[in-house]
Each structure stands twice: as C-alpha cells, then as structure tokens.
Amino acid sequence: MFTPTTNNAIGGATAATGAFAFGARPATTTAPPPSFGAATSTPTFGAAPATTSLFAAPAATPAFGAPAATPAFGAPASTPGFGATSTAAPAFGTAAATPAFGIPAATSAFGAPAATPAFGAAAATPAFGAPAATPAFGAPAATSAFGAPAATTAFGAPASTQASAFGAPAPAVGTVAPTFSFATPATSAPTTAPPAFGFGTTATTAAAAMPASLSSGIGSFSFPKPQATTAASLNFNTTTTTATAQPFNTGLKLGTTNATTTLGGGGIFSKPAGQAAAPAASTFVGLGGIDVTATQPKLGDNKQDGIKIKETQVPDEIIKTVDGLKAYIKQQKTISSDIGRTSTSKFTNVSHEITNLKWALQNMATLVEGSNQQIRLMRQETVKAIQSLEMAQRTQDTPAGLQFENNAPFQYFQCLVAKYEQDLIAFRQQIALTERHMHAISNPQSISPDDLKRGFRQLNESFISLAGRLHEVHQRVEEHKEHYLNLRRYRLRDTTNVFERIDNPPLPTVEPQRISSGPTPFSNISALMNKSYAAAASSASNATGN
C-alpha cells in the first residue's frame, strides 16, 4: 500500500480545497478506488466474503481495493476493501470522508466537488443512465447522469462557485461555457481559482476550442461562425491570448434537445502565445478602379427580378466619349433628314441652265469662227491692195524706156480681168435664177403637198443609200489599212503607224502675215515689189484654181 509523504506539491504551493494539485499531500491515508461499476459475490484477495449483490447494487464485501459496501457504478460503499480505511470511501470521482489516492482529506475526489456521486452517476439513483440530483465528472449538475438530460453543465464544465476541474476551461464573466453532454449549456460565473494542472498561476487566457453541436434528428454537416472561448492553460507561468477557431458542427440528433459541447484544448496543444487572428482579405478592384462587390446584391436582399442584367459603372472618360458620339450621330441624322426633305428641282434648274449656256457658248463659238474667217479674208484683201499700191508706185517711178521690164501691171490687169469674169458668171447665174423665179411666178403650176412629200422622201432615200455606200467603202478602206499595217509589222518588223499623220493631223499654226507700210526712200523698192508681185501671182493662181 502506498503511503503519501508530508512533502508539499511541486512549486511549493499547497493544494487548495476542491482543487487537484500535482503531488499534493493528503491529510490521511487513502483507500484505492473500487472496481469499475459493480461488486462481486466472492471477495478478492484480502477481502471478507460478501453476500449476494446485483448489478449496480451495494454488496456486503467489496472487491479488491474497494469499500466494504459495494456500490453501483460510481456509487459510494459502506465497507472498505483491502487496504482501505474503515470509513465508507467514495468511488472514483465522488466525495467521501476519506479521500482517494493523491487527494487531500475531507475534500472531493479527483476533479469533482464535495458530496457528489461517483464517476458519471448520482448517489440517489445509481442506475445506469438514470437522472440524478448531481452532475457527472468534473461539474455540478442537478438532474441527469451519463447519457440523460441535465439541467446544468456536464463533463468538463466548471462549477458556478468553485475552481475548474482538470482540463476544463475557466470562462470569463457572462460567457456561456460549452459542455460535452446532451443538455443545454450553462452560464458560468467568474472565478480566480488556479487551474487544475499547474504551479499555482492564475489562468487568465483562453485557447481555441472546437465545439461540436449534436441536435435532435439527422441534420446537416456545417461549420458555423467561429466562437471565442476560454480554456485553462497547461503552460508553465505563461499566458495565452484569446483566439478563435472554426467550430465543428454536425447535425446528429439523438432525440434530445440541442446542446453545444466544447472540447477544450489549451496550453501545449493550443496556438502559440500572442498569435492574432488572420488578417482580412483585400478588396478586389475591377477595371477602371471600381469596386466589384459594390454592385453585387447584399445577403439580405431577397428581391429577385425576372431578368438579371449585369451592370457595372463606366469611367467618366468613356461616358464623355459615348455622349459625344451620341451627339454627333444625332447631328448627322438631322443633316440626313434635311437632305432627304430637300427638293431636286434646284439641281434640275441648274442642269437646264448649264445646257442653255452650252448652246449659247456653241453659238458664240460659231460666230467667233465666222468673224475669224472674215478677218482672214480682210487680211488677204488688204495684202492684195497693198501689192497693187506698190505696183502702181513702181510703175510710176520706172522711166518709160524701162517699162518693158516691168510686167507687174500686166499680171495685175490679168488677175483683174479674171475676177471680173468670175463676177460676171456669178451675176449671170443670179439673173437666170431670177428669171426662172419670175417665170414661175408668172406661170404658176399646180403642185400638191403629196408631190412635195414624195419628193422629200426620195431625197431622203437617196441620201441614205449614199451614206450606206460611203460606209461600205470606208469599211473596205479600213480593212486595207489594217492589212497593210499587219504586213509591215510581220514582214518588215516595223510597228510604226504610217497613217498617224493622216488620222491625227497637226493643228496648223496660223501666223499673221507681215503688213508692210508704203514705200520709203530708204527701202529697196524693187525687191519689195518683186516679192509682192510673186505673192500676188501665187494668190491669184490659187484663187483661180479653187
């Protein structure tokens, strides 16, 4: 049998009443805990024989290391077993007059308050799973044992008036301590008791916890919002800061009310000291510096339209450009409508005026051409008159003995006689025409309009036949021309067009003839007269030839 010494606990602090200190000195000798749950009819080594017993019922003689009165599972006994005191010692986790191994005298068992039942059961009703007046291991309860609903906290929850048990967190003021049972959570009160495992330091920090939710029925599997919880620290003379963790939520329902259970972990298995929460994610910014989340619907908006349109804010530069484009398009539409309503009569009038101006220009060109022809004729007549004047002057200046050499007067009179002859012929023709006309007037003939129509038709047909023959001859000439050019191209290897001068005659350059003045004493009159007579003779011959 192990006998504890009188030394103090590690760290020099005496264990407080109701709390467990590592290596604390008990007040008196302790008895070993009873066996798990039930007593046997035959005592074990070092124990007296016992009477008959039932499951979870007290027996006369306990088993090895158990009290004399064998209790039910977690219930006190009346008779101690081998190596135990004569007083009735509680089972594991229950209050007794004599404490168990490592627990001070006149205090509660491991992790439980005084005057409490055994591990997981109550003293009044020792049956398995039946309601009891006190809670299970580590926390006070008013109703149920293991597996039954209770009015207060269950496994691992701290008491409302004492220090926390082994491994149970010490919550702050006004916080709801999560439990590990199937009952509702209990509201704990502030406490300053030292933790169950440590060196007398006060646990003022909390560690992360992961609650597991068990609800009635078969529910969903989710991760609700993180919860800030507190738990006792297992470190040595250190504190930890409050941190949050993602809870673990299940939808398992066992036919009881919803109860949130906390599996508290701290110290060695918790987050490092001084570690803060994760920083918030940066806001996503879209194109143009516009917050994309600003245009998204909020969580509370349940309005659903029939047609969802994706709309985003457009930068001011693009809006200005679009507005300018719209104004330009509107202006162009206005101009187009004005053009569409404009009448084309003005353009028609202008085209008519242009045509009239073209006809007037053609008439003016004809008049100018006639005037030019008259000018040329007058110029020729002026030249002839000058030549005649020079001839007369030279004839007068020539002496009488030399007149046989001067033939200019003879040519002059010859041309003059020829001209008179032509004029007489022309006059005779005019006189004959006049006589016929007068004869026709004096002797009228009956000519009907049909005769005139017939005569004009015959003239028209004759002109058409002549035009057809002329065209036929022209085609033959063109064929001979092409044949000749091909022969020159293939036989003589000459690609030049010999008919180019005929097809495209150069424009004649008309130079104004020099009009000389009368004879002067300083000029060579004989040379001028000879030239003048030669020019006059050539012009006269050309005139007679024409």
Swiss-Prot record:
What post-translational modification information does the record give?
O-glycosylated; contains O-GlcNAc. O-GlcNAcylation increases with increasing ambient temperature.
- The UniProt record lists the keyword Metal-binding: no
What subcellular locations does the record give?
A: Nucleus, Nuclear pore complex
Cellular component terms (Gene Ontology): nuclear envelope; nuclear pore
- Which keywords appear in this protein's UniProt record, sorted alphabetically? Glycoprotein, mRNA transport, Nuclear pore complex, Nucleus, Protein transport, Repeat, Translocation, Transport
Biological process GO terms, please? mRNA transport; nucleocytoplasmic transport; protein transport
| Region of interest (17 X 2 AA repeats of F-G), residue spans | 22-200
Pfam families in alphabetical order? Nucleoporin_FG2
Query: What does the similarity note say?
Result: Belongs to the NUP58 family.
Q: Whom does it interact with, and what assembly results?
A: Component of the nuclear pore complex. Interacts with Nup54. Interacts (via C-terminus) with fs(1)Yb; this interaction occurs in a RNA-independent manner. Interacts with sbr/nxf1. Interacts with Nxt1.
Q: What is this protein called?
A: Nuclear pore complex protein Nup58
This protein's species is Drosophila melanogaster (Fruit fly)
Gene it is expressed from: Nup58
